[in-house]
């Protein structure tokens, strides 16, 4: 009796090839990475979140109200002066110092919940001296903060990259990966 031999691949061979293809695809993806602007924007969004968490810890440990002022190309933490109770830049801390982003990056903040600033307040704020400016976000000594949504935008040639940081009133932060917008 003659045995007829089956042709084809065994399950083990198929799984081995699939695993090798997956490893190669992973290696190629990791070596290519994302677009440079996208990576830089992601880095700055994570930096913002880390410094905000540091400011929350500072507020809790020191028992003080801390403010966050968002500008078009950066942010700055503030505290009230003991003398006149006016807001001033938080100094003496490298981590919580003023941050200036590249001109290609823009920040925009939307306050959630109640609106404690009107459009006329913002016009007045723009006309104020830098020393008299007030924060948009308050960080309370219990770690809570004013809820907000911060949008970071990076323009890179024909593509605009977006990252959104969302903060709730309990101080929890989330980084949302937004889709890229073609122009």
From Swiss-Prot:
Membrane-crossing segments per the record:
9-28
This protein's major location comes to: membrane
User: Is the Iron-sulfur keyword given for this protein?
Assistant: no
Q: How is it modified after translation?
A: Cleaved by prepilin peptidase. Methylated by prepilin peptidase at the amino group of the N-terminal phenylalanine once the leader sequence is cleaved by prepilin peptidase.
Q: Which NCBIfam families match?
A: IV_pilin_GFxxxE, typeII_sec_gspH
User: What binding partners and quaternary form does the record give?
Assistant: Type II secretion is composed of four main components: the outer membrane complex, the inner membrane complex, the cytoplasmic secretion ATPase and the periplasm-spanning pseudopilus. Interacts with core component ExeG.
Query: Which named protein is this?
Result: Type II secretion system protein H
């Amino acid at each position: 009796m003659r045995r007829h031999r089956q042709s084809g691949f065994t399950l083990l061979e198929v799984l081995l090839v699939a695993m090798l293809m997956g490893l190669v695809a992973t290696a190629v993806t990791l070596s290519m990475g994302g677009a440079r602007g996208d990576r830089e924007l992601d880095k700055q969004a994570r930096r913002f979140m880390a410094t905000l968490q540091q400011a929350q810890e500072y507020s809790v440990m020191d028992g003080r109200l801390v403010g966050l002022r968002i500008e078009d190309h950066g942010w700055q933490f503030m505290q009230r002066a003991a003398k006149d109770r006016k807001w001033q830049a938080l100094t003496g801390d490298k981590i919580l110092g003023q941050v200036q982003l590249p001109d290609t990056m823009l920040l925009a903040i939307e306050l959630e919940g109640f609106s404690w600033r009107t459009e006329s307040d913002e016009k007045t704020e723009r006309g104020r001296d830098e020393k008299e400016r007030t924060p948009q976000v308050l960080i309370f000594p219990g770690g809570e903060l004013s809820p907000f949504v911060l949008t970071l935008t990076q323009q890179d040639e024909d593509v605009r990259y977006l990252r959104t940081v969302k903060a709730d009133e309990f101080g929890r932060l989330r980084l949302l990966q937004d889709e890229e917008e073609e122009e």
